[in-house]
Amino acid sequence: MIGYGHSVHLQTHWRDNQGALFPLSPPCTLVTFSDAVARSVLESHDKLFMRWESAFDQGHHTAWWHIIKDQAVTLSDLSSNTRSKVRRGLKSFDCASISRDTVLSEAYEVYKSAFARYETHEKEFSRNEFLNAVKALPDQTEFWGVRDKVSGALVAFSENYVEAEVSFYNTIWFEPSALRKYSSYALFYEMNLHYLEERKFRYVSDGARSLSHDTQIHDFLESKFGFRKAYARLHVVYAPWLRVAVAVAFPLRNLIEKVRLGPFKKASILLKQEEIRRECAKVAN
């Protein structure tokens, strides 16, 4: 979902989403802090839970990861099939950095058509909600757009959070008709080239393992563009009442997952996160 509140705690930028705190700062930059310190931040801001990572990309396989690319790649480095699709995408579309004003004036219809593709519990934004969300994004946000070469129409856009020579491809929205013409191949190729080759960033990332929906985008990036899993240990602390609720509901997680109603979907996501947290704790111990 595009749009979120943001704040700074523990020398880290945080994203406030649906009453919880998630790191915006890259996991490679996070300072070490205890669960007790995290609970004090959580309580002072009256949030439901706080999530973060440690031991990022240290070679230990865990149940939690980010999908990253840390090696610059030219077109000739890609498979012949991927090269062909990138070229076909670039033949039909122009991909370039765009301004926030351009997103505000042109991107809502792209967002709306792309949103319909996702199976998610999240609510679709109205135009005004979308505009307010884009306006509120942090100054570290960079936008990329994809335009049809014939019509000039915007058919896709990406919202990237940039910090410490890392670009996080936070949300990306494609019109379905543009996807069929390989717009995604063109956009990822151009953004990877820009950040890794031209600006010499440490890495680019499409974010952490998804809990709420399956876009298959991570598999796509791994198989087509050489992204990889950077494993980490997942940490979560909860508000006191939620900690009790999670502990009580955890043995019922498989049953709750089968109920497709909205509140149960959210509960299932929360319990999946807790399952991963426990698995990571076992590895650490």
Where are these regions (language model features)?
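N-terminal accessory interaction module
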Residues: 1-55
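A conserved beta-strand-loop-helix scaffold within acyl/acetyltransferase catalytic domains
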Residues: 1-17, 52-59, 68-180, 195
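Acidic-and-aromatic substrate-binding clefts and catalytic sites of carbohydrate-active enzymes
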Residues: 29-32, 103, 208-214
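Well-ordered, non-membrane alpha-helical segments in soluble/globular domains
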Residues: 31-39, 127-129, 186-190
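Surface-exposed alpha-helical segments enriched in charged/polar residues
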Residues: 39-43, 87, 135, 189-193, ...
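A structural signal for short coil/turn segments at secondary-structure junctions
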Residues: 45, 137-138, 199
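Aromatic (often tryptophan-rich) hydrophobic motifs at membrane interfaces
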Residues: 142-244
